[in-house]
């Protein structure tokens, strides 16, 4: 359980946890999101401590069919755009009408937000709407983008989901907005960004676990595998390695 709580933040907090202070004992693992300074501090201190990931700007990819309400899709895109001017919101749809209507709705809704400055900057610089002939064509793009958040706002989301290989978290169906995942749905929303979902997963208890291998040989077992170890060590030019095995074989 939790036995210490410290109210600290920023890159200096990451340094304090990694190296320790006169009041804070150094830790082994640092996890969780933060701003660009926190992300860079975690990157630089990886090796001194373990980290979960280096999280970048937030991302959302929405795959939507023509049956969606454009205003709702626009709201989903802006839910990430309002985070930061460097956030990215992408829509892939098979409906040209939806694409046009969503583009118009984004402009109207963004202008009314208290987070307008960040949302408009994000959408203008990083917002993308892509039209495809068939929603099946969206899957290779989604796997290539490996987005932090992937919304499948389609009639049969399970069919597309079965072909998704790379995404931080997937939200199935028109009634599953990404914002619910941020706050109350259950799965952790500390997720890989910047296409890192190709090789990493969201924060979980596994980030606080590790494995230790162990080996035990008896004399008979060493007699079987030892000569191969000797040969490999000699080929690698490491005679002391070979000798540590050979002496046991000759004993």
Named regions from a protein language model:
Residues 49, 104, 251:
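Oxyanion/phosphate-interacting regions
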Residues 53-59, 85-92, 96-104, 115, ...:
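Gly/Ser/Thr-rich active-site loops/lids in small-molecule metabolic enzymes
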Residues 16, 40, 72, 101, ...:
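Phosphate- and divalent-cation-binding pockets in alpha/beta enzyme and binding domains
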Residues 1-90:
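Conserved NAD(P)+-binding/catalytic subdomain of aldehyde/semialdehyde dehydrogenases
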Residues 135, 143-251:
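C-terminal core of ALDH-fold dehydrogenases
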Residues 7, 11, 24, 35, ...:
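Electropositive phosphate-/nucleotide-binding environments in soluble metabolic enzymes
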Residues 79, 83, 91-167:
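A glycine- and small/hydrophobic-rich beta-loop-beta segment
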Residues 3-6, 27-31, 35-36, 52, ...:
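Structural motif
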């Amino acid at each position: 359980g939790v036995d210490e709580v410290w109210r600290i933040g920023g890159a200096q907090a990451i340094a304090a946890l990694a190296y320790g202070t006169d009041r804070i004992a150094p830790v082994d693992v640092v996890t969780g999101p933060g701003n660009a300074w926190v992300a860079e501090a975690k990157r630089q201190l990886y090796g001194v401590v373990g980290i979960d990931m280096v999280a970048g700007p937030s991302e959302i990819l929405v795959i939507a069919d023509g049956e969606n309400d454009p205003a709702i899709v626009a709201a989903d895109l802006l839910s990430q755009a309002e985070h930061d001017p460097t956030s990215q919101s992408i829509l892939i749809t098979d409906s040209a009408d939806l694409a046009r209507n969503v583009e118009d709705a984004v402009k109207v809704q963004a202008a009314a937000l208290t987070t307008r400055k960040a949302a408009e900057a994000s959408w203008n610089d990083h917002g993308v709407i892509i039209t495809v002939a068939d929603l099946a064509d969206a899957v290779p793009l989604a796997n290539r983008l490996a987005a932090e958040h992937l919304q499948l706002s389609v009639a049969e989301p399970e069919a597309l989901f079965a072909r998704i290989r790379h995404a931080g978290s997937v939200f199935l169906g028109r009634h599953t907005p990404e914002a619910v995942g941020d706050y109350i749905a259950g799965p952790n929303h500390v997720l890989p960004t910047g296409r890192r979902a190709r090789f990493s997963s969201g924060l979980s208890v596994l980030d606080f676990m590790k494995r230790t291998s162990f080996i035990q040989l008896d004399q008979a077992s060493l007699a079987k595998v030892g000569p191969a170890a000797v040969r490999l060590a000699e080929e690698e030019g490491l005679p002391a390695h070979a000798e540590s095995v050979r002496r046991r074989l000759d004993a």
